[in-house]
Amino acid sequence: MSEYTGEVVHGGPSDVRELAHLTIRKASVSEQDNNAYLLTCRATGEQLLIDAADDPHRLRALVDEGTGWLDAVVTTHRHWDHHRALADVVEHTGARVLAGAQDADELPVPVGERLTHGDRVTFGEVELEVIQLRGHTPGSVALLYRDPEGPAHLFTGDSLFPGGVGNTFGDAVAFASLVDDVEQRVFATLDDDTWFYPGHGKDSTLGAERPHLAEWRARGW
């Protein structure tokens, strides 16, 4: 298997990263380059999908690339482009539905588990930590996997990208909230080798982005 790069294109194949206890599959599922991530517990085969963003047929194929069944779907935030296929995926898989508490009522299906900062999400023998990053939306959540045999892995939705935090649409209060949370809850607590996976586009590491934090705050976006 080729080395994981995180570079995927709409209509193209998944990129796959094999960790000791977890397999991560990344696929681009829309013309907006929305990323969907399928996480598979290697011990039990149970699976969790992050953001059923679009293209239900592609997402079903992604699930089949793993073990073929889906246990849970987490929606990172309320924006329409991150849950266009959620209703279809839930209908066809029966997966449990999780989302940030403040965004849950905006989703097209009932949310069974409303997530808040510090919660844990488990599937199989895998545990993810919930990090609320307030600003892009009130209920935006990131999911952290602490690999016992390597660097941490962080799924950030639209709250953190290579080159800056997520869009806060000119709202200075929301921007301050987001950049504060990203600094305090991500960069202040996690190591530089933490790999993060955003809701659109390419991945990065915290070490690559850390030198630019003051620049992001100063420019205001």
Question: Residues of each region from the PLM?
Answer:
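Short, well-ordered secondary-structure micro-motifs
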Residues: 37, 60-61, 108-111, 143, ...
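Short beta-strand or tight-loop elements
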Residues: 20-22, 124-129, 139-141
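Short Gly/Pro-enriched turn/cap motifs at secondary-structure boundaries
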Residues: 27-29, 112, 132-136
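Metallo-beta-lactamase
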Residues: 68, 137-221
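Divalent metal-coordination and catalytic microenvironments
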Residues: 39, 51, 77, 89, ...
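Conserved beta-strand hairpin/beta-sheet module of binuclear metal-dependent hydrolase folds
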Residues: 13-68, 142-157
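Short glycine- and acidic-rich boundary segments immediately preceding or forming the N-terminal edge
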Residues: 1-16
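Active-site HxH/HxHxD metal-binding segment of metal-dependent hydrolases
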Residues: 44-47, 54-129, 151-152, 212-219
